[in-house]
Amino acid sequence: MARGSAVAWAAFGPLLWGCALGLQGGMLYPQESRSRERKELDGLWSFRADFSDNRRRGFEEQWYRRPLRESGPTLDMPVPSSFNDISQDWRLRHFVGWVWYEREVILPERWTQDLHTRVVLRIGSAHSYAIVWVNGVDTLEHEGGYLPFEADISNLVQVGPLPSRLRITIAINNTLTPTTLPPGTIQYMNDTSKYPKGYFVQNTYFDFFNYAGLQRSVLLYTTPTTYIDDITVTTGVEQDSGLVNYQISVKGSNLFELEARLLDAENKVVANGTGTQGQLKVPGASLWWPYLMHERPAYLYSLEVRLTAQTSLGPVSDFYSLPVGIRTVAVTESQFLINGKPFYFHGVNKHEDADIRGKGFDWPLLVKDFNLLRWLGANAFRTSHYPYAEEVLQMCDRHGIVVIDECPGVGLALPQFFNNVSLHHHMRVMEEVVRRDKNHPAVVMWSVANEPASHLESAGYYLKMVIAHTKALDPSRPVTFVSNSNYAADKGAPYVDVICLNSYYSWYHDYGHLELIQLQLATQFENWYKKYQKPIIQSEYGAETIAGFHQDPPLMFTEEYQKSLLEQYHLGLDQKRRKYVVGELIWNFADFMTEQSLTRVLGNKKGIFTRQRQPKSAAFLLRERYWKIANETRYPHSVAKSQCLENSPFT
């Protein structure tokens, strides 16, 4: 890839890369329309963990063939949520193996009687391996958490005499192995003087709790039997016009017509097209800008697609509306450009994590987090260390929060994790990530891994292949991974478009010595930039802080130490910010749960907010910095105003 001049991925406008996906079928977000219905299955499910020694009792006794309550005692389990923190059973919190969920559903009669209707079961995520049965029939399997999967169950609900209720059974195994993402190992403790026979532990190589279960929504939705299966959109700018290139996939018939209309925010039609692919030109287009970068950020159009088809059962129609943000992304050797303007990431790393619900999706928590991001003046975050719920990305699109979209490639710490089976799975996961998230304007870069052992020769080949595969899937966005390796030893850095670095000076290194941060940070930046000539993001930095701990002069774990550490980092960042450093993402937005260890007191405490989303002292420091940066980088240059209520306790 050429350096020195902007590499504008949007220049691939007519190239519709969706067809490069190896997966069969699209993964459009289920929505209601004139032709589509949805029935959410959130709420209480029956739940049972298989505590048998071999964790196989559920399969041996075929729990899926009859109501789960007939197999033995069950619990009420809320969906979505992680199962770990719901009960008072300590065994369940750290359970490794198969758990079983079940829900009985009554379908609308028209879903079962109308043969024009296609009925689909969709699971938002199931960590990590899932098998699904409908009325005892093996319907679907999926490997990997954090991403949706679905199955057409029309043939199970529209054929023959139907039971009064539809019984959905889902078995989930959260075991991590050397070939899962994230990877892990199972260690058997064979010393029978210390451990019972068959005792084992799950070893993980990442610093967050391995929550599991049905952590996102489960739902049923319908489409016509001939339907819009997928839409791929890329955008560009030509002089003062916006370009929207689209490709539409249809399944169920070869005899159909397609109409595409682009509507502005006032629901006025600004462009029309027909056929499965085309380009819509929007004179004087309103571009999608990040939050605080423009007076009118996050402008969204709507691409309305109408399908009409002739089938053996008669004419059918299908309708789907896709939000579209017109924007470009480009990278030079020292800048990250959005719509041709230098963009500086001033934001956070996050986790999907909260009390009780674990990694379960929660609307109040989502809205609270976005209010805090806006109050903070943050314009970006990384989905550390896995793809977040689709609803999160939709909020980012609407609010202008830029996203580095990361796959679950975290914990790749051992040589045995870089094997061909893992590589194949990793590439497939990237296909699923791109398929799901490709149309979000907020997503400006893919991250294929966090802190892999990238000094290994095997890791170099592995990362090269995953990055190349991701670029082939989506030429419209840059690709990176997040490194904590030495600049001279990193085997994956030559293949990324942007260097992302994690470093914890005066915390994990030379802890307590705040006076060393500026020198060490400057050395880090200069070494990496001299070798690779690529823009750099400080993708992690921070300090563990127990809310309410105070000491002056600052000592580790106090709020004063976290503030002082951030101040020293900021001085170092400012020395390079106008040169080739293009972003800073604090670790972390909020405290989060981890496995128990001697260095973790009820989880990781590096958040600038507590797990309950209350601010530590550093939150106010970071807020002051981010609003200052926002006013320096805004286009056009008008003063940004703090987004908080007049009576906010944070003002």
From Swiss-Prot:
Domain of life per record: Eukaryota
Active site (record annotation): 451 (proton donor)
Keywords: Glycoprotein, Glycosidase, Hydrolase, Lysosome, Signal
Stated regulation of activity: Inhibited by L-aspartic acid.
EC number(s) per entry: 3.2.1.31
GO biological process, one term: carbohydrate metabolic process
Pfam families linked: Glyco_hydro_2, Glyco_hydro_2_C, Glyco_hydro_2_N
Cellular compartments annotated: Lysosome
Gene3D superfamilies attached to this UniProt entry: Galactose-binding domain-like, Glycosidases, Immunoglobulins
Gene Ontology molecular function terms on file: beta-glucuronidase activity; carbohydrate binding; signaling receptor binding
Gene Ontology CC annotations of this record: extracellular space; lysosome
Keyword check for Membrane: no
Family named by the database record: Belongs to the glycosyl hydrolase 2 family.
Subunit structure: Homotetramer.
Role noted for this protein: Plays an important role in the degradation of dermatan and keratan sulfates.
Name of the protein this chain belongs to: Beta-glucuronidase
Source organism of this protein record: Pongo abelii
